[in-house]
């Protein structure tokens, strides 16, 4: 990879791209993306685990194991790395070593993945005990995991008295063991029995067992830890029984053939049972292509047989179609997988096989959900509801239906099914499903903007996550809780903002009304003030005229003017008074005809100016 390629993107971008390609089944491209990410951030344990998963899907088991071990190099307690190493070892056929790491991870964090891993590893070991040649266990002679286990428990084992861990001879070890014979021990341990013998021989070397290792433990303590572990595992494997339904179904099928034919299983029956085991083993080990080819080959042969040779031929054919469909899902052949599972469903309906019908509906719903057709998945799974028998099955079913409704943004239905799943999970007492159901309900309530209820359910989910020690779920829930709380704050802000806007609008309306009322009251007031000012000016002018007239009359009387002139002067004075009265009358009319509350101030101004003009005119006339 060139420097230019490295700089073109970032570590999170390559990680996201790799995860998307992994989900799409493009494992080669996903590996390249994860490799690019590791160039940017060397040794990132999450990236190494992600690339290991891709190698495992492609069947490159050595590279898958190398990446898983590399993820544990700096942090031996990294649970994802432990789980991935266990899965890789299981796929490689090292069931005992896989079981060791499943148990180690379960002690660190009791998650469902480790629990299921323990169960399937136990079943694989039990299935191999009957015929050890069916599974080849690789005897690497590497007991380093025992020393690591001892070192990790230094605080607990360091101060234990050696007498509690020691046995004097090889014969005492055998007497203390719970197994009845060496033959049984050899059969249960398989090729690990060689390691047990080797450890027992080491105990005979007195000089060796007195030595100590860096952690402070003696070699004898370390050897006895390994022997005790193998003894415990032997008892455990001997007592355990197969748990998966497929094993029970195969045995029930064999018993049915025995009842129908009333004779020992024929070569045909052995062939079918062995073939079903091989098909299932190939699929679980990551070889979906091999599983598909095997199932198609067996189906072709079974279809050639008659009903007498295989009494439950129809049930077997449906089972094979189901196996073919499951392999096609893993290969990404969704259309073909849907056809195969529908054939399984048709056979189940035709021959009234409720368990087979439930299985087919389950698988058809899975196909629809994988391709994003959530409504069809809902319809299919809702048809399966009456066939669900156990509380745990109902819990899972309602959760998946609710998840599909959530994907369709139908939050009410998602909440309803989530609450049903929550109820059945509580009845079952399964903390993992209580966690899943609570998260589903909370997510639906967030979409419904019921943030308060969502916070309550997220808090409930957080409690369950703490109880099952799921740190990743805790972090995700805490983040979702923060978002829900922010949603509550935003809702409060929006509510307050709407209240503020409404109050502001109301205040503006009130102020506008007050302004209009004040303006209307001021307009006539201005008119009256102007009128009074003009009238007062006119009265002052009249007073001046009267004084001037009186002075003139006095002068004329003293000057011996004629009566005619006196009469003319009086007439002139009367004329002036008439004009004054006319002006006063016009002013009175003006006062009575003042504009109403909605009149304009400009018009009042013009009328006042006109009145002033009349007064000035009168003054000029008087002077003349």
From Swiss-Prot:
Summary of subunit composition and partner proteins: Component of the outer dynein arm-docking complex along with ODAD1, ODAD2, and ODAD3. Interacts with ODAD1; this interaction may facilitate the recruitment and/or attachment of outer dynein arm docking complex proteins, including ODAD1, ODAD3 and ODAD2, to ciliary axonemes. Interacts with components of the IFT complex A, including IFT140, TTC21B/IFT139 and WDR19/IFT144, and the IFT complex B, including IFT46, IFT52 and IFT57. Interacts with CFAP53.
Subcellular localization, as worded in the UniProt entry: Cell projection, Cilium; Cytoplasm, Cytoskeleton, Cilium axoneme
Keywords assigned: Cell projection, Cytoplasm, Cytoskeleton, Repeat, TPR repeat
Primary residence: other
Task performed by this protein: Component of the outer dynein arm-docking complex (ODA-DC) that mediates outer dynein arms (ODA) binding onto the doublet microtubule. Plays an essential role for the assembly of ODA-DC and for the docking of ODA in ciliary axoneme.
GO biological process: brain development; cerebrospinal fluid circulation; cilium movement; epithelial cilium movement involved in determination of left/right asymmetry; heart development; lung development; mucociliary clearance; outer dynein arm assembly
Region listing for Disordered, in residue ranges: 511-624
Effect of loss of the gene: Heterozygous intercrosses reveal deviation from the Mendelian distribution, with only 6 homozygous out of 53 born mice, suggesting increased death in utero. Most surviving homozygous mice present with small body size, some with hydrocephalus at the age of 2 weeks. They display a variety of left-right body asymmetry defects, including reversal of lung lobation or dextrocardia. At the cell level, the trachea and fallopian tubes of mutant animals show absence of outer dynein arms from the ciliary axonemes, and consequently severe reduction of cilia beating.
Mapped TPR repeat ranges: 11-44, 46-78, 79-112, 273-309, 318-351, 358-391, 395-428, 435-468
Entry-linked PANTHER family: OUTER DYNEIN ARM-DOCKING COMPLEX SUBUNIT 4, PTHR23040
Compositional bias of kind Basic and acidic residues: 520-557, 576-588, 595-624
Matches recorded under InterPro entries: ODAD4 (IPR040111), TPR-like_helical_dom_sf (IPR011990), TPR_rpt (IPR019734)
Organism: Mus musculus (Mouse)
Pfam families on file: TPR_8 (PF13181)
Gene Ontology, cellular component aspect: 9+0 motile cilium; 9+2 motile cilium; axoneme; extracellular region; outer dynein arm docking complex
Name this polypeptide is given: Outer dynein arm-docking complex subunit 4
């Amino acid at each position: 990879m060139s420097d230019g390629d490295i700089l073109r993107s970032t570590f999170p971008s390559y990680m996201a791209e790799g995860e998307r390609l992994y989900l799409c089944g493009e494992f080669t491209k996903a590996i390249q993306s994860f490799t690019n990410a590791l160039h940017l951030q060397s040794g990132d344990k999450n990236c190494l685990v992600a690339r290991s998963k891709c190698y495992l899907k492609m069947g490159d088991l050595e590279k898958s194991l190398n990446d898983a071990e590399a993820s544990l190099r700096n942090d031996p307690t990294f649970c994802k790395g432990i789980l991935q190493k266990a899965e890789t070892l299981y796929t490689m056929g090292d069931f005992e070593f896989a079981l060791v790491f499943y148990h180690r991870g379960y002690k660190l964090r009791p998650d469902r993945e480790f629990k299921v891993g323990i169960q399937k590893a136990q079943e694989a070991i039990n299935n191999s005990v009957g015929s050890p040649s069916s599974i080849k266990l690789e005897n690497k002679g590497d007991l380093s995991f025992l020393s690591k286990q001892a070192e990790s428990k230094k605080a607990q084992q360091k101060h234990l008295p050696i007498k509690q861990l020691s046995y004097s001879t090889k014969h005492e070890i055998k007497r203390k063991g719970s197994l009845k014979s060496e033959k049984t021990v050899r059969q249960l341990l398989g090729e690990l029995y060689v390691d047990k013998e080797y450890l027992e021989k080491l105990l005979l070397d007195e000089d060796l067992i007195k030595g100590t290792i860096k952690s402070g433990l003696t070699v004898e303590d370390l050897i006895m830890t390994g022997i005790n572990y193998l003894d415990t595992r032997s008892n455990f494997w001997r007592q355990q029984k197969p748990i998966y339904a497929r094993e029970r179904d195969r045995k029930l099928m064999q018993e049915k053939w025995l009842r129908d034919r009333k004779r020992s299983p024929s070569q045909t029956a052995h062939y079918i049972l062995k073939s079903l085991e091989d098909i299932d083993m190939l699929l679980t080990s990551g070889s979906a292509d091999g599983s598909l080819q095997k199932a198609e080959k067996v189906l072709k042969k079974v279809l050639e047989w008659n009903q007498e040779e295989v009494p439950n031929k129809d049930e077997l054919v449906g089972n094979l179609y189901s196996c073919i469909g499951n392999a096609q899902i893993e290969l990404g052949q969704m259309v073909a997988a849907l056809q195969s599972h529908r054939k399984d469903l048709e056979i189940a309906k035709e021959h009234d096989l409720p368990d087979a019908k439930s299985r087919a509906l389950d698988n058809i719903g899975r196909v629809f959900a994988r391709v994003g057709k959530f409504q069809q998945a809902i319809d299919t799974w809702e048809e399966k509801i009456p066939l669900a028998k156990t509380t745990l099955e109902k819990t899972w079913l309602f959760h998946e239906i609710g998840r599909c409704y959530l994907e369709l943004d139908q939050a009410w239905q998602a909440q309803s099914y989530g609450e049903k799943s929550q109820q059945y999970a509580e009845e079952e007492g399964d903390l993992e499903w209580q966690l899943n159901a609570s998260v589903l309900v909370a997510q639906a309530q967030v979409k419904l903007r019921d943030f308060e209820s969502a916070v309550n359910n997220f808090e409930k989910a957080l409690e369950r996550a703490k109880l099952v020690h799921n740190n990743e779920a805790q972090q995700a829930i805490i983040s979702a809780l923060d978002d829900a709380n922010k949603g509550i704050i935003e809702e409060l802000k929006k509510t307050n903002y709407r209240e503020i806007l409404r109050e502001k609008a109301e205040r503006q309306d009130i102020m506008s009304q007050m302004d209009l009322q004040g303006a209307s009251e001021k307009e006539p007031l201005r008119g009256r003030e102007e009128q009074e000012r003009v009238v007062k000016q006119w009265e002052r002018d009249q007073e001046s005229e009267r004084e001037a007239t009186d002075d003139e009359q006095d002068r004329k009387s003293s000057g011996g003017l004629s009566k005619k002139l006196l009469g003319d002067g009086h007439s002139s004075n009367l004329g002036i008074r008439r004009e004054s009265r006319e002006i006063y009358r016009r002013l009175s009319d003006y006062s009575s005809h003042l504009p109403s509350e909605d009149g304009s101030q400009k018009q009042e101004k013009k009328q006042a100016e006109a009145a002033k003009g009349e007064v000035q005119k009168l003054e000029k006339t008087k002077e003349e």
